[in-house]
């Protein structure tokens, strides 16, 4: 039995207007135009549904092949965390949730390096998912480990070092098609300025609620409202007074801004989300994200505890807001 996930593509020829958008938008060049779109390379399909999502007539259906649902999980497994670290992570999660009143679990993120085993007790999803979708699942309490053949976003997967970059993404062409950027020059600059890990340097992504840790983490991701992000920012600088230089763009939110930048730079970073992350998940429009490198977590948690002694309750009680008076 194969570990691969494959998809079948069905086109409603009666509805199709042969506009060619599916061929232009497909990041992995599944289609050619020959009297309408022809999915000549269905084996290249990632199940991202960019083609069906941009079809003006909803004429395209992308479905996972039944054999993929029965695929065996034969990846090597090992325990990737010790008991002391488990208790530390649980305490971190409890402090953040209790003090900041987070609705969602803080998420532990571990990138599985090439040659490393997968963590014990973590499921591989049967279908492909976007990395940002896996983060949304983890904030709700689900643990997932995803090798490249379970990722459905070629952009995030290549950024995180699981694959190489498809040509349409490497050139920035697809961002022009989406009307996200004005010119090819702007698209090329955006692509060239974002960081990327070495292709094929990573085996998988692993995400889980921090209070149910499955591995040591590279980054902790927190989703919350702007006020909660403010306290995390203040907690990080509680002992230093340092002001933060955040890098946010509206592009590649979870993969670059929440994961890769904090992991690489050893600094916290905020993200407002991105088109793909918001369009493919249930993240609400009042939420934003922060990535915290694990190296900073002890000071962040200590800072949160200190802030909870006075300024957090004072701010939430609105102590400087004049009382409403009626004449």
Positions of PLM-derived features:
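Short cysteine/histidine-rich metal-coordination sites, predominantly Zn2+-binding motifs
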Residues: 35, 40-44, 64-75, 92-98
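Short, ordered beta-strand-loop transition motifs
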Residues: 2-3, 33-35, 212-214
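Acidic, serine/proline-rich low-complexity intrinsically disordered regions
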Residues: 76-327
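Extended, small-residue-rich solenoid/repeat segments and analogous flexible loops
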Residues: 2-4, 8-11, 15-18
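Residues immediately within or flanking Cys/His clusters that coordinate Zn2+
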Residues: 13-23, 42-52
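Residue-level detector of conserved, well-ordered beta-strand and adjacent loop positions
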Residues: 12, 32, 40
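Iron-sulfur cluster-binding cysteine motifs and their immediate structural context
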Residues: 21-36, 50-66
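A broadly conserved detector of short glycine/acidic/proline-rich loop/turn motifs that flank catalytic sites
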Residues: 15, 66, 226
């Amino acid at each position: 039995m194969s570990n691969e996930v494959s998809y079948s593509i069905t086109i409603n020829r009666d509805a199709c207007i042969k506009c060619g958008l599916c061929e232009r938008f497909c990041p992995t060049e599944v289609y050619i135009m020959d009297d309408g779109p022809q999915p000549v390379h269905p084996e290249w399909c990632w199940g991202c549904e960019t083609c069906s999502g941009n079809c003006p007539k909803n004429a395209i259906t992308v479905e996972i092949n039944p054999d993929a649902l029965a695929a065996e999980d034969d990846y090597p497994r090992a325990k990737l965390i010790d008991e002391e670290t488990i208790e530390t992570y649980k305490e971190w999660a409890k402090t953040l949730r209790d003090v900041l009143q987070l609705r969602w679990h803080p998420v532990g993120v571990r990138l599985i390096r090439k040659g490393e085993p997968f963590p014990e007790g973590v499921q591989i999803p049967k279908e492909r998912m976007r990395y940002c979708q896996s983060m949304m699942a983890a904030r709700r309490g689900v643990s997932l480990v995803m090798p490249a053949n379970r990722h459905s976003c070629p952009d995030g997967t290549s950024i995180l070092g699981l694959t190489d970059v498809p040509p349409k993404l490497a050139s920035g062409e697809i961002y022009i098609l989406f009307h996200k950027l004005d010119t090819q020059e702007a698209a090329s600059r955006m692509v060239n300025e974002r960081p990327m890990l070495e292709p094929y340097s990573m085996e998988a992504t692993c995400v889980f609620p921090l209070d149910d840790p499955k591995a040591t983490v590279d980054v902790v991701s927190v989703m919350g409202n702007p006020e909660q992000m403010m306290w995390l920012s203040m907690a990080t600088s509680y002992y230093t007074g340092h002001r933060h230089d955040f890098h946010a763009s509206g592009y590649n939110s979870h993969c670059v801004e929440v994961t890769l930048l904090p992991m690489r730079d050893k600094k916290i970073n905020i993200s407002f989300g991105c088109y793909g992350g918001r369009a493919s998940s249930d993240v609400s429009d009042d939420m934003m994200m922060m990535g915290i490198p694990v190296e900073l977590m002890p000071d962040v948690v200590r800072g949160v505890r200190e802030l909870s002694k006075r300024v957090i309750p004072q701010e939430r009680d609105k102590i400087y807001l004049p009382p409403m008076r009626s004449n």
